[in-house]
A protein has these predicted regions:
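Glycine-rich phosphate/pyrophosphate-handling loop used in enzymes and phosphotransfer proteins
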Residues: 1-214
Length: 214
C-alpha cells in the first residue's frame, strides 16, 4: 500500500488547492484565508449565513471539490458549513437541510450530485436530517460566466419539488457559494410555490459568500 502511495505521489503529487505548492492540500498561507467565521447576508427576505469570503483561493478549493472530487477539498467545504450550522443563530428548531441539486449533466460528469453528497455527510456529523426534495426541472447553463441578470433568467423556474416530496417545518438550504443569490432565490421560490411558506421558515447556509453580492 505504501509503495502504491509513493508511486501515486510521483505521478500526481499533492499540491496546495490555493497556490499549487507541492506537499500539502492547503499550505499555511492559504489556510489563513480558510478560517471560518460567520457572515450574514440576505437574498430578498431570506437570511443567508456563510463561513468564508469568496476569494481566489476559495474559488480554487470549490473547483477542486466540485469538478475533481478531491476529498480534502470536500472536507474543507464540509467543515466550513458545519461551523456555520453550529455557530449561527437560526431561531426555532428543529430544522432540516435541503441541498441545492446538480443538473443531470453535471451529475453524469462528476459522478455525483455535489451538494447533495456534501449535505449527506454534514447531516451525519451534526445530526440534522437532510431533506433531498428539490430537483432541476429544465436545462440550465453554467452560472459561472453569467451576469447577475442572466443568472436570474437562467435559474427562473428551474427548480421543482420531487414527486411525493414532503416539506414541513423549518428548512435550511445548503450550497457551496452565494454570489448573486439567484440559485437560493429560485430554491426558495420552488418551496413557497408548493404552499410551504405558511408552515415554516427558509434560511440558507453556504460555505462562501461573495461580498457584496454581485
Amino acid at each position: 500500500m505504501k509503495t502504491f502511495h509513493d508511486l501515486s505521489q510521483l505521478i500526481f503529487p499533492t499540491r496546495c488547492f490555493g497556490c499549487g505548492r507541492l506537499g500539502i492540500n492547503i499550505c499555511t498561507e492559504c489556510r489563513r484565508e480558510w478560517i471560518p467565521h460567520i457572515y450574514k447576508t440576505h437574498v430578498d427576505s431570506m437570511k443567508v449565513h456563510s463561513g468564508l469570503i469568496y476569494t481566489p483561493t476559495a474559488s480554487k478549493i470549490i473547483l477542486a471539490a466540485k469538478e475533481v472530487s478531491i476529498q480534502g477539498a470536500d472536507q474543507l467545504l464540509i467543515s466550513a458549513i458545519i461551523h456555520v450550522l453550529e455557530k449561527a443563530k437560526f431561531g426555532a428548531q428543529p430544522f432540516k437541510l435541503i441541498p441545492i441539486p446538480s443538473s443531470k449533466g453535471s451529475q453524469r460528469r462528476r459522478g455525483r450530485s455535489f451538494i447533495v453528497d456534501l449535505t449527506h455527510q454534514i447531516s451525519e456529523v451534526v445530526g440534522i436530517p437532510m431533506n433531498d426534495c428539490l430537483q432541476i426541472s429544465r436545462q440550465v447553463k453554467d452560472q459561472s460566466g453569467l451576469s447577475r441578470s442572466k443568472r436570474v433568467t437562467n435559474m427562473n423556474g428551474a427548480f421543482t419539488l420531487k414527486k411525493d416530496a414532503i416539506v414541513r417545518g423549518n428548512q435550511i438550504l445548503i450550497d457551496d457559494v452565494v454570489t448573486t443569490g439567484a440559485t437560493l432565490k429560485e430554491a426558495a421560490r420552488a418551496l413557497n410555490s408548493q404552499g410551504f411558506h405558511a408552515v415554516g421558515s427558509v434560511s440558507a447556509v453556504t460555505a462562501c459568500v461573495a461580498l457584496p453580492l454581485r
